[in-house]
Every structure is written in structure tokens, then in C-alpha cells.
Amino acid sequence: MTKREQSLATPYLQFDRTQWAALRDSVPLTLTEEEIVKLKGINEDLSLDEVAQIYLPLSRLLNFYISSNLRRQAVLEQFLGTDGQRIPYVIGIAGSVAVGKSTTARLLQALLSRWPEHRSVELITTDGFLHPNKVLNERGLMKKKGFPESYDMHNLVKFVSEVKSGADYVTAPVYSHLIYDVVPDGNKVIKQPDILILEGLNVLQSGMDYPHDPHHVFVSDFVDFSIYVDAPEDLLQSWYINRFLKFRQGAFSNPDSYFHNYAKLPETEAIKIATQLWNEINGLNLKQNILPTRERASLIMTKSANHAVESVRLRK
């Protein structure tokens, strides 16, 4: 098969780092180095170059899509003879644990909110829609946290549906990584944002991923543009273990931390436990439930060492 035939056979346009960076055009970088430091995750090296070469072109693309969507809404309103109701544009960000979804989400929130249109951009993680630990324990699902059956899908779909319906305000539960649980009465209020970024393991999942659940509407049905942050599994495992070790020196030392008993472990023992957690939970979830959703994404960002994006695939 020739390169042209291969290109025609795939639903994606492929860009290497240099080709993608060229699509920035003249979009200015509105974030300072200090602001970028605050946005990055505990385990990531994030440079101004990475933001300029990868995330500015992405924010430019999203701005085009969002503007196009607003024009489409205006056409529909004109056809129906209705007054304009503000319908948020929903961006979904999926990928493995430790791949850097949260950093990508925070960066896009910062960049999109600084476009000349001064749009309001809200960010919600699907972690808040995990069942509380009490429920997971009762159902024997604590070792399946992050798997499809560990989520309150009814409430997650209800939340996204209400946002997409233009509700004046919608509440979302909040998750704490410190206590490793949903925060009781810790709701976050969303008030008709222009853009909602929804970040989580499961935003691309559909009915095929929930055979145990009879409902027929899924988060992915409400997502306007989806991003899958990808990386080879050996890198993901390495990043997960390194993140675990950094938490062991930091967050785990807090007496309120769910993982406080890991704080004083020797490094060799901590690595052993992190590897076990990866193999039995996170790596398994990646193979069974997360990776199979990758090809449903509008855009796939593939990372190499140091969390640097080396290629981008954009759905035609």
C-alpha cells in the first residue's frame, strides 16, 4: 500500500511535531512561564515551547470549531424562529491515568478563556462522579476504581445533559485525591459557561463499554470535540510510578491522606506497591476500557519521553 493509499484508508490526518507547530499561525502566547508552572502536573516537564508548539495550534483549531458551532446554532435558531439560548460547547479529554489529562485540560481552559471573545470556560473532572468509597466497598469494587462499573453514570449523563440543555446552573460533585473519595456536600456550581471541558478516563466510552448498564445515553453523545492523550504503555507505567513516589514524599505525608501509610515506606517497597497497583488496576483498566476508546476521538495527541507531544492525529 502506498503512502497515499494509507492516508486515504485512515479517518485521521497525521502531523508530526514540526508540521503541527506550523499551524499555530500568529496566535500569541498569553501565558507566562510562572502561570505555566502553576498549571502543570506534579510529574510533568512543561515548557513554553511545548505550549507554543502544541497547545496554541490546538487552541486555534478549537476556536475555529467553536465559532463554527455558534454559526450553526444561529442558523438553527433562524430556521426555528427561536431566541438564542446559550448552549455550551463541550470538549472531552480522555486517556490513561498519569498521561497528563489534567494538565492538558487546565492549559486549554487558560488558553481558550484568553481568546479575544473572552469566553467563560469551566473544567469538570469525571472523578467526582465515582461512587463514594462506602458504596464501592459494599459492592466489592474498591479495586475496580476507575473502571466503568465504579461510576455513577446516571448522574454523570444527567449532569452533561443539563449543561447541554442550557440550564441556568448545574452542580457537579467534587473528588479529593487526598482522601481518595468524593467530598461530601462538595458540589461545584456550573453557570452556563460558553465552553465546558470534561476530563476523565471515561468520556469517550459508549454502550459497548457498559454491558452491565441498560441506559442508552452516554457522555460521549454530548461531547462536541474529543481529545485522547496517548503514550506507550511502558512510559505510562513509568510516569505512574514516578508520580506515586513524588506523592509519597509530598501529599501522602499529610495525616489526612488516604495513602498516609505509604509515606514512610522505603523507596524499593514503594516502587513495588506502585508497580502492583499499575498491573492490577490502572494498566488493566487501560487495556480493557480506556485504550479501546482512542479511535473514537476527534484528535489524538501522542506523547514521548518527558511528556513531549511528538505527533497529532486529527479526524478528517
UniProtKB/Swiss-Prot annotation:
Q: Where in the cell is it found?
A: Cytoplasm
The UniProt record lists the keyword Kinase: yes
Report the catalytic activity. (R)-pantothenate + ATP = (R)-4'-phosphopantothenate + ADP + H(+)
Xref: CDD domains: PanK (cd02025)
What pathway does the UniProt record associate with this protein?
Cofactor biosynthesis; coenzyme A biosynthesis; CoA from (R)-pantothenate: step 1/5
Supply the InterPro entries for this chain. Answer: P-loop_NTPase, PanK, PRK/URK
Question: What top-level class of enzyme does the UniProt entry assign?
Answer: transferase
What is the predominant subcellular site recorded for this chain?
cytoplasm
Q: What is its EC number?
A: 2.7.1.33
Q: What are the protein's UniProt keywords?
A: ATP-binding, Coenzyme A biosynthesis, Cytoplasm, Kinase, Nucleotide-binding, Transferase
Q: Per the record, GO CC terms?
A: cytoplasm
Residues the record lists as binding ATP: 95-102
The answer to keyword Cytoplasm applying to this record is yes
Q: Name one GO biological process term.
A: coenzyme A biosynthetic process
User: What does the similarity note say?
Assistant: Belongs to the prokaryotic pantothenate kinase family.
Recorded hits in HAMAP family, A to Z, give:
Pantothen_kinase_1
NCBIfam families tied to this protein: panK_bact
Q: What is this protein called?
A: Pantothenate kinase
Q: What is the lineage of its organism?
A: Bacteria, Pseudomonadati, Pseudomonadota, Gammaproteobacteria, Enterobacterales
